[in-house]
Amino acid sequence: MDLPPASFSFFLPSVYDGTKLECRVHLPSMLQNIESATTWPNRGAIVAHPYATLGGCYDDPVVGFIGSELLQAGCIVGTFNFRGAGDSEGRTSWTAKPELGDYVSFYGFMLQYLHFLKLALTPGEEVDSSKPHKVSDGVKNRTDIHLILGGYSYGSLIASNVPTLDTMLDLFQFAPITTPTNKPTPMREIMSTAKRIAALSLEQIQMSHNLADVPDLRALTTSISYLLVSPLLPPISQFLTVFSTLSLNVKTDTPKGPHIPCPRPADQQSSHHTLALFGDQDTFTSAGKLEKWSDEMVHMPCSQFQFRMIDGAGHFWRENGVEVRARHALKQWLSEI
């Protein structure tokens, strides 16, 4: 079973340069009626698609079956088209830096969207926004919002390089409302869209709401995890970034917008629950290289990294029976985090 038709479709501006990105969200069955919605665990997941130049888009079949499994597990599943894919504006870059900005835009949307829903669905919960929030490395400790940062192939490369959660919260919490030319900043446009889609989601289950204009993203405890499907390793990953280190540039009307360094992917993936899912017949990265990398990640201090290698699976997951085994591995991991 693939992803069903989207619950909501919309466009977001990229924080990199304002490029319009085609986006959609799929709501799980628990959010179809008010009774089950109030007990929904507030889980979301992003699944980014493979390289647009080679035909990648959010309708990719691997994005579909991974997203379907996440949806069945109760996650709100969000997908978007990078620049140059589908009806998104622009074209694929040579450096992946614009695409990193695209992912960050949708990441920020999902954080705010889940935040709006959490406060609306648990109105009796006391939240003291004067206390500093706690970023959880896992969801075994109490957490209000859990977001899985996922991607397939090129999408996993971009997901691996996003800024830290603290940086993301600050970027969207303290974004200026307008640019010096009185245009809404991309971050504020994204927040407005998150509020609009949250309101539509609540109206769909006939639930009244009074959403804040600007959500306090630090009032709730948020945790993140990583899901990397057919991850790309050097030298392929280096070719796609022209051998440069990824960093985030944010659009402003000033000559030089904020430049945000990104953390080392290995540090983020070992310190948060992470699943790398790949086949032993991957044509882009050898099984030996993937196993060696995974073993090194597993043995980092206090690592929360896990991997599953699916026998007989290639990079495109078209071989007989491999999708079923991949779904089983993903379902097992989701039950553990």
Feature locations, PLM:
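Conserved alpha/beta-hydrolase
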Residues: 65-89
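Gly/Ala-rich beta-loop-alpha elbow adjacent to hydrolase catalytic centers
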Residues: 150-159
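N-terminal cap/lid segment of alpha/beta-hydrolase-fold proteins
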Residues: 1-43
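The serine-hydrolase catalytic nucleophile loop
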Residues: 55-65, 287-288
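Short beta-strand/loop motif that positions the catalytic acidic residue
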Residues: 270, 275-278, 282
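Catalytic histidine-centered segment of alpha/beta-hydrolase-like enzymes
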Residues: 53-54, 90, 313-325
